[in-house]
Amino acid sequence: MFYPEQFDVIIIGGGHAGTEAAMAAARMGRQTLLLTHNIDTLGQMSCNPAIGGIGKGHLVKEIDALGGLMAKATDQAGIQFRTLNASKGPAVRATRAQADRVLYRQAVRMALENQPNLMIFQQPVEDLIVENDTVTGAVTRMGLKFRAKAVVLTVGTFLDGKIHIGLENYSGGRAGGPPAISLAQRLRELPLRVNRLKTGTPPRIDARTIDFSQLTQQLGDNPTPVFSFLGNVKQHPQQIPCYITHTNEKTHDVIRNNLDRSPMYTGIIEGIGPRYCPSIEDKVMRFADRDAHQIFLEPEGLTSNEIYPNGISTSLPFDVQMQIVHSMKGMENARIIRPGYAIEYDFFDPRDLKQTLESKFIHGLFFAGQINGTTGYEEAAAQGLLAGLNAARYASEEESWFPRRDQAYIGVLVDDLCTLGTKEPYRMFTSRAEYRLMLREDNADLRLTEKGRELGLVDDSRWEHYCRKLEMVEQERQRLRNIWIHPNSNNLNDINNILKMPLSKEANGEDLLRRPEMNYKLLTSLPLFSPSLEEPQAADQVEIQVKYEGYIARQQEEIEKQLRNENTSLPVDLDYRQISGLSNEVVAKLNDHKPSSIGQASRISGVTPAAISILLVWLKKQGLLRRSS
């Protein structure tokens, strides 16, 4: 039977991609349905209990700037907050938080259940309704059919998921979760390229059986960072420490002696695992010269005794896992309460997607999260938000939107995926962005909140907060520009005591702030330049904008040069064999990738500047030389 109500957007899957997609579509006023196999696991942190990190924290801030959920949920659930790379420049500073799994899940569920225009329904999805190359709905296990104008697939590792522990394996979407076998089979019937990937998780340890007195304690930062631009330290629950131990030669011997029982090293697992989050087996074999690896013991929550040993992801048999754990300092008597495992699952080639995350071949069908070959909660959430907003715009026949590489890490993420594809789980790093100085955590709202408001993603309270911050920053910069000091001024001694070279010519507050030995706090502690802003976000923004103004201006010039042909559209169905002058290699690569713009084409390995020139000439001759916004 058909459900009596028709929806604008259906989201299939309630993980980090699905929840952001559902919230985005509903915030934009579309009637949205979230289908999940289990309402109790909405927003579940299936692997490590942490949000953020290098590159990943930038994504979370961007999601937040667009009105998303992840940062706000983390502020309500974070039990330890740190700023990584704090001693480095602002471009690579990143926020990371340990999160209480239960509190995080509760925060996500509460947000979903209180979101207008959003209905949640518990049933596994087994089929899609596709008519004339257009998706029109979904079918659940009990045969109930839902109609919608757009569908977003956010199914994580559940598609034909297979869990491996040693040489044993069984079907599963994650430990304790069923696989989506029927849906996987249905998707394989569609004209989409599909492959397998693998990820893994470590065994969980009972904290009561660890001797923490032998271990190095790792505390959070003071003052404590917040994730959301609307966040406040008062929202944080109790803060607790993590601990550090190390593997050793005994650990490595145990692993080397049991590789014949590893599903990875015996060829049972065929999927490729994440390069930047390798299993402990991989680390020991790939870095044979290392006699130790650092392992972080991360609490799973305030009301749980479970510890997540970050760094020993493994699919070795359980008896070997016990030997590995017991070989490490402080863990000699530790008890494993959940075994580690690897999981293989289907993913679909993201080169078959537009940068809006809509399929190039099935209208109205969007993909987000691990189904696109990424790894990580943050990467999934970012894709979910983008897919959700574009599904909402598709449903109301509005023009789609996605950020460029110079506008957001979300733009870097989708451009990398849709242009280059991936053969291993893709993870975000700051090093993937050409314009890092423009794409900082601190200015994510300045880059994206205005666009989010225009798209209908940003509510009144966030918009008012953003406008107040903008006003504070501009007023403070104007104030500093208007205060001048001269070499013969009476109160010069205080300033010269801070400056490495005494002031030799007149300068205003911004001139002084540009000096490397000066910072905003020091400057505004001087009577002439006081008082300082009370809002830390605005104060940080003033200092960064002033100190890096010249560098930012130069990077902006580079961006403008690069954008001249970036958005020149290419027909998605173009057969490049018909364009004379292109080499066979270039033709093969362009036909394989099917880029949607000259910018995308230029980033494909082997596509030369000469080939780009040929494409531009061909487009001009065909009357197709136009630039999309």
From Swiss-Prot:
UniProt keyword annotations, A-Z: Cytoplasm, FAD, Flavoprotein, NAD, tRNA processing
Cofactor names: FAD
Main subcellular location: cytoplasm
One cellular component term from this protein's GO annotations in UniProt: cytosol
Subcellular location: Cytoplasm
Database matches in Gene3D superfamilies: FAD/NAD(P)-binding domain, GidA associated domain, C-terminal subdomain, tRNA uridine 5-carboxymethylaminomethyl modification enzyme MnmG/GidA
GO molecular function: flavin adenine dinucleotide binding
Record-listed FAD binding positions: 13-18
Function: NAD-binding protein involved in the addition of a carboxymethylaminomethyl (cmnm) group at the wobble position (U34) of certain tRNAs, forming tRNA-cmnm(5)s(2)U34.
Listed name of the protein: tRNA uridine 5-carboxymethylaminomethyl modification enzyme MnmG
Organism: Photorhabdus laumondii subsp. laumondii (strain DSM 15139 / CIP 105565 / TT01)
